[in-house]
A protein has these predicted regions:
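Thiamine diphosphate
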Residues: 1-155
Length: 155
């Protein structure tokens, strides 16, 4: 596992990084929402679920080399962004998949396509269902995707 908070370093434009390696599902995040992913992963690890976490860092240019590696390795992909889901990071991942004929199961978390009221970050993340609890829930439901509970979570 890579330390999430590190000293300043030069970041290559268009290159993401693996934050922690697992086998069950890949969680791709962009920006500070990755801190919530880290919290969710700690909870999932206690239940013997070991997701990989990738900090993609850039939407444009998106790290195509890293996406190829991720999509070849994992059946289940969860994208998490503190931005609009429609036309955002998750959409960029889906476009990349379509252009390259990938058929992985993908769920996108972020701000839904509706008006969101005011509140603290934690309140809004919870209301929009992309806080650490939502990330935890979606990982569980995607891995148990044949159950009816998965359909209830799809936004």
């Amino acid at each position: 596992q890579v330390e999430w908070e590190t000293e300043m370093e030069i970041i290559e434009i268009g290159k993401g990084r693996m934050v922690c390696e697992g086998d069950d599902i890949a969680i791709l995040s962009i920006g500070h929402i990755g801190n919530y992913v880290t919290k969710a992963i700690k909870k999932l690890n206690k239940e013997k679920i070991f997701p990989s976490h990738y900090d993609m860092r850039f939407v444009k240019p998106i790290d195509q080399e890293l996406l190829h590696k991720i999509l070849k390795k994992y059946k289940f992909i969860l994208t998490v962004e503190d931005g609009c889901v429609m036309g955002g990071f998750g959409s960029a991942v889906l476009e990349f998949m379509a252009e390259n004929n990938y058929t992985n199961s993908v769920q996108r978390l972020g701000i839904p396509d509706r008006i969101v009221e005011h509140g603290s970050q934690d309140e809004l993340y919870s209301e929009c269902y992309y806080d650490d609890e939502a990330i935890y829930d979606f990982c569980n439901k995607m891995l148990d995707h044949q159950g009816s509970k998965y359909e209830e979570l799809v936004i």
